Amino acid sequence: MTLNEKKSINECDLKGKKVLIRVDFNVPVKNGKITNDYRIRSALPTLKKVLTEGGSCVLMSHLGRPKGIPMAQAGKIRSTGGVPGFQQKATLKPVAKALSELLLRPVTFAPDCLNAADVVSKMSPGDVVLLENVRFYKEEGSKKAKDREAMAKILASYGDVYISDAFGTAHRDSATMTGIPKILGNGAAGYLMEKEISYFAKVLGNPPRPLVAIVGGAKVSDKIQLLDNMLQRIDYLLIGGAMAYTFLKAQGYSIGKSKCEESKLEFARSLLKKAEDRKVQVILPIDHVCHTEFKAVDSPLITEDQNIPEGHMALDIGPKTIEKYVQTIGKCKSAIWNGPMGVFEMVPYSKGTFAIAKAMGRGTHEHGLMSIIGGGDSASAAELSGEAKRMSHVSTGGGASLELLEGKTLPGVTVLDEKSAVVSYASAGTGTLSNRWSSL
């Protein structure tokens, strides 16, 4: 199976159908207010397609990592008329309100996802129901297939067609991602899922060359499989974040008290040798922004070269490194970014990460760079920098995108029906998809 062989929502008969849509509304909520609605807005093209075609939407999502209860204890939810008090932070109720405002139509909130048959039975074409957080029940993510199936059977009874638009959880084998489509015998990708699949199919297939991977984050161990897999596909590799110091130490540089995974030094040496053999140019930081403690200060130390003084820890890439990385991105026609360059949450150490975001945004806007942000912290940084809207694609799935880049298959994609006619990588590009996303 290649990524882009999956059935599209465009192939589904939606008229008069109750359409079960697995969305990813796992958004940040503070004091009952949504602080970033990007994931909700990302689902709008799919929802509008169903509603325009004369269907109704039954939406399923999770929010956070609540401590779920077994289905056998469902009375705990039903006796209170909704979510127990200790779970209030994970309720999807604020999302229903936000979605209603975005869709300009009522959204009915069902306070118990497994006790919504009555609400769903009264739906008419054009109606939208949002079920409460599916993770309030343990069976959603149970390791036991029979438990997942038991929950999926109830949810599957609410609809006629299953659409998956939750790329962010596509790496999960769960009741709502894999259980329901197995029961209904039909499953198609929504527009967000299609867009995600399209871009990753291109970067993992035949991307415009040269292709640069910018990889950062805290641990080499978190990115071993990604680095191994991508080394077969890229022309340049830029390494930043705390993981860079393991590579620098492996080359004999002083790293002060910067983070280092001693157990991964040999892997770092091996990867650098492998890159050399494959003629992949690996570029490591040539200067650093440092301090003696892990805290923000007005005037952090900027090193002259790769070496970090004793008693100091590097917290961002330095200005010379920024210049070199930006120049490298400027040479390329495709770029994939996974992981920040420094502790970008602290202003003194955000310049490296934001410079990468700006270089990718500018390259996309001015020179047609195909730029893909692999979700997670990189997506947050792209948003904070103001560059997200200029990127070709900002993934909604940190974990899912990481697993794809590692060369793994995603259960939530594999389970979907096959396309009636397989399209090529070239035709899986932005095309008409970009038009659906221009207003987001």
UniProtKB/Swiss-Prot annotation:
SUPFAM superfamilies attached to this UniProt entry: Phosphoglycerate kinase (SSF53748)
Annotated Pfam families: PGK
Family statement drawn from the similarity comment of this UniProt entry: Belongs to the phosphoglycerate kinase family.
Residues the entry annotates as binding AMP: A218, K219, K223, A242, A314, E345
Entry binding sites for ADP: A218, K223, G241, A314, N338, F344, E345, D377, S378
Residue numbers binding CDP: G217, D222, G241, G339, F344
GO annotation (BP), single: glycolytic process
Residues that bind (2R)-3-phosphoglycerate: V23, D24, F25, N26, R39, S61, H62, G64, R65, R135, H171, R172, K219
Binding annotation for Mg(2+): A218, D222, D377
Main localization (coarse): other
HAMAP family associated with the record: Phosphoglyc_kinase
Cofactor needs: Mg(2+)
Subunit structure: Monomer.
GO cellular component: cytosol; glycosome
Additional detail: In T.brucei, three genes code for phosphoglycerate kinase isozymes, which are transported to different cell compartments.
GO terms for MF: ADP binding; ATP binding; metal ion binding; phosphoglycerate kinase activity
EC numbers for this chain: 2.7.2.3
Catalytic activity: (2R)-3-phosphoglycerate + ATP = (2R)-3-phospho-glyceroyl phosphate + ADP
Pathway per the UniProt entry: Carbohydrate degradation; glycolysis; pyruvate from D-glyceraldehyde 3-phosphate: step 2/5
Designated name of the protein: Phosphoglycerate kinase, glycosomal
The organism's place on the tree of life at top rank: Eukaryota
Keyword terms: ATP-binding, Glycolysis, Glycosome, Kinase, Magnesium, Metal-binding, Nucleotide-binding, Peroxisome, Transferase
InterPro entries the record matches: Pgk_euglenozoa (IPR027250), Phosphoglycerate_kinase (IPR001576), Phosphoglycerate_kinase_CS (IPR015911), Phosphoglycerate_kinase_N (IPR015824), Phosphoglycerate_kinase_sf (IPR036043)
PANTHER family referenced in this protein's UniProt entry, alphabetically: PHOSPHOGLYCERATE KINASE, PHOSPHOGLYCERATE KINASE 1, CHLOROPLASTIC-RELATED
UniProt-annotated binding residues for ATP: A218, A242, A314, D377, S378
